[in-house]
């Protein structure tokens, strides 16, 4: 009896179910089948207005390059990196699965586009500044710093 329960529990652990990705109540397969106009209706206002004005030639070229790289890659391979300076590009469903090198002003940060990134800007995934790491205060920084011994 106990072995059957153990076997049943082990079988349940093997069949782990993962949460299916949904963007505003629509799963990824349906997002990929949608036209751009239908997808635009799901976006927040700022991005919806941006896409309603139309994508520029550079943005359309980036989408085409990413799709070409995804098509050229093998079944279980990562596609080739597509480098871009377009930090203001909105991540669309057709970009999911691609690898994009996003320029941060110094280097290209490689980023694999995942479904959770849909609706964000590319620039949000390549930080353009080095976060401040506060060290010791310098001389004259505060009145109490007069009593801090020099190195």
From Swiss-Prot:
Keywords: Acetylation, Ribonucleoprotein, Ribosomal protein
GO annotation terms (biological process): determination of adult lifespan; ribosomal small subunit assembly; translation
SUPFAM superfamilies listed in its UniProt record: Ribosomal protein S19
GO cellular component, one term: cytosolic small ribosomal subunit
Endpoints of the signal sequence: none
Gene Ontology MF term list: RNA binding; structural constituent of ribosome
Disulphide connectivity of cysteines: none
Modified residues (N-acetylalanine): 2
Superkingdom classification of source: Eukaryota
Family matches, as HAMAP family: Ribosomal_uS19
Job of this protein: Negatively regulates lifespan.
UniProt family annotation: Belongs to the universal ribosomal protein uS19 family.
Protein name as catalogued: Small ribosomal subunit protein uS19
Gene from which this protein is expressed: rps-15
């Amino acid at each position: 009896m106990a072995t059957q329960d153990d076997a049943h529990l082990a079988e349940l652990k093997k069949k782990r179910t993962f949460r299916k990705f949904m963007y505003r109540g629509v799963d990824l397969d349906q997002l990929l089948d949608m036209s751009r106009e239908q997808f635009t209706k799901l976006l927040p206002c700022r991005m919806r207005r941006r896409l309603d004005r139309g994508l520029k030639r550079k943005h359309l070229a980036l989408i085409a390059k990413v799709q070409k790289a995804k098509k050229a890659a093998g079944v279980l391979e990562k596609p080739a990196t597509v480098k871009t300076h377009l930090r203001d590009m909105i991540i669309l469903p057709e970009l999911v699965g691609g690898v994009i090198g996003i320029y941060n002003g110094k280097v290209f940060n490689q980023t694999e586009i995942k479904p959770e990134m849909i609706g964000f800007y590319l620039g949000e995934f390549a930080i353009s500044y080095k976060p401040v790491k506060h060290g010791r205060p310098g001389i004259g920084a505060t009145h109490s710093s007069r009593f801090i011994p020099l190195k």
